[in-house]
Amino acid sequence: MVFQGLSPTFVGSLSDTIGRRPVYIFCFVTYIAANVGLALSNSFIALLLLRCLQSTGSSSTVNLAYGVTADVVTSAERGRYIGLASVGPIIGPSLGPVLGGVITQYLGWRYIFVILAAAALIFLFLLIIFFPETCRNLVGNGSIPPKSLWNRSLVSLFKKGSKLEDHASGRNLPNAGSKKSNPRNTNPLKALNVLFEYPTSPVIIFNGLSYAIYYAITSSLSYSFHDNYYFDDIHVGLSYIPIGVGTIIAALGNGFVVDWNYRRLANKAGIDIDQGRHMDYETGKRLGFSIEKARLQIAVPAVVVACISMLGYAWTMSLRLPPIIPLLCLFVFGWGGTAAYSCMNVLIVDINYSSAASATAANNLVRCLLGAGGAAVIMPLINVLGMGWTFTAIAGLWVLLSPLVLFLLFRREEVYDEISDSE
């Protein structure tokens, strides 16, 4: 999990400089090589090191996906597409243990890595053939052909040369070639700098806390149902389904609600949707349109729902009420927590539109560190305070830190102007 948090920090800023496509290729090659090594490994040390390498290759692709989404999707539609991009990372940890157990039982554990390597190889093959470069620093809105062969798909290389030459000459494209993809210009600490920038930093901190709470619940869930209801291993596994279903529903459906609220506020402000579709954070400020308000109006109620359902889960579990009640609370928490988390992901991309991969890498770093911390401390807290009071304290912390994002909602203009004046 440490490498899952650290590697995207460097890969994100690199993709903002040299493009998404070459970094994607590097990540897939790294991931495939690690899986092949894991399948052939015979020592624990080798397994440990190769798992770190595997995490380095796989975790960075999540941030690249958010970067590609920011490249090709406008702010008016960003909610639904970022939601779709998050489905894979959400479903993976839920289905992975189940599928891994089946593969191990019938084929052996080595075949897990063989299948992963084969699947990644197929994706790499399709990526090399079809996936175009999307980084706007290099290709603008897609009309500027990239100069490097690494940034061109095989399909584009076989197109007629006349069209490519016309575009490459820069005619009718005043911003053609405005950015050069020089790896030496990459700042590996760019993602870390984002952590100290307003208004990104409070959003990332709040998002990391939301993820840590989610991780604390899921990591303690097996113990809770086994200790309070004496569930066996099969029933403990089934108890993850409600929170997983709620999470998936939020990931798939919440983006449409976020986009609807964006259009509603744009129309209310008298901004034509064709203009509003391309607004970034600063453009919205000049037009009197608050992009963060469009996102937070959905996120804040979702946090309230998540807090209430978390309290319901903890106290009904402590009182040992029928298990259907805490399971229903888990379903609601899965929806509320994921809805809030996805809204904040969209807002992070909105604020850092030109460097989305670096910003999401910073978000990933905080998310993984706080998530690991949440998973580490939750069981000692439950042993000392009990289920009910532990999650009551966590809900209270979540509510106390909510002003971090409400501060953005109500005092955004004043603080932003103060920062601009000081600069």
Swiss-Prot record:
<feature type="glycosylation site" description="N-linked (GlcNAc...) asparagine">
    <location>
        <position position="141"/>
    </location>
</feature>
<feature type="transmembrane region" description="Helical">
    <location>
        <begin position="111"/>
        <end position="131"/>
    </location>
</feature>
<comment type="similarity">
    <text>Belongs to the major facilitator superfamily. CAR1 family.</text>
</comment>
<dbReference type="Pfam" id="PF07690">
    <property type="entry name" value="MFS_1"/>
</dbReference>
<feature type="transmembrane region" description="Helical">
    <location>
        <begin position="369"/>
        <end position="389"/>
    </location>
</feature>
<feature type="transmembrane region" description="Helical">
    <location>
        <begin position="25"/>
        <end position="45"/>
    </location>
</feature>
<feature type="transmembrane region" description="Helical">
    <location>
        <begin position="298"/>
        <end position="318"/>
    </location>
</feature>
<feature type="transmembrane region" description="Helical">
    <location>
        <begin position="203"/>
        <end position="223"/>
    </location>
</feature>
<protein>
    <recommendedName>
        <fullName>MFS-type transporter phiL</fullName>
    </recommendedName>
</protein>
<feature type="region of interest" description="Disordered">
    <location>
        <begin position="166"/>
        <end position="185"/>
    </location>
</feature>
<feature type="glycosylation site" description="N-linked (GlcNAc...) asparagine">
    <location>
        <position position="352"/>
    </location>
</feature>
<feature type="transmembrane region" description="Helical">
    <location>
        <begin position="238"/>
        <end position="258"/>
    </location>
</feature>
<keyword id="KW-0813">Transport</keyword>
<dbReference type="GO" id="GO:0005886">
    <property type="term" value="C:plasma membrane"/>
</dbReference>
<keyword id="KW-0472">Membrane</keyword>
<feature type="transmembrane region" description="Helical">
    <location>
        <begin position="321"/>
        <end position="341"/>
    </location>
</feature>
<comment type="function">
    <text>MFS-type transporter; part of the gene cluster that mediates the biosynthesis of the antihypercholesterolemic agents phomoidrides which are dimeric anhydrides.</text>
</comment>
<dbReference type="InterPro" id="IPR011701">
    <property type="entry name" value="MFS"/>
</dbReference>
<feature type="transmembrane region" description="Helical">
    <location>
        <begin position="82"/>
        <end position="102"/>
    </location>
</feature>
<feature type="transmembrane region" description="Helical">
    <location>
        <begin position="390"/>
        <end position="410"/>
    </location>
</feature>
<keyword id="KW-0812">Transmembrane</keyword>
<feature type="glycosylation site" description="N-linked (GlcNAc...) asparagine">
    <location>
        <position position="151"/>
    </location>
</feature>
<keyword id="KW-1133">Transmembrane helix</keyword>
<dbReference type="InterPro" id="IPR020846">
    <property type="entry name" value="MFS_dom"/>
</dbReference>
<keyword id="KW-0325">Glycoprotein</keyword>
<dbReference type="InterPro" id="IPR036259">
    <property type="entry name" value="MFS_trans_sf"/>
</dbReference>
<dbReference type="GO" id="GO:0022857">
    <property type="term" value="F:transmembrane transporter activity"/>
</dbReference>
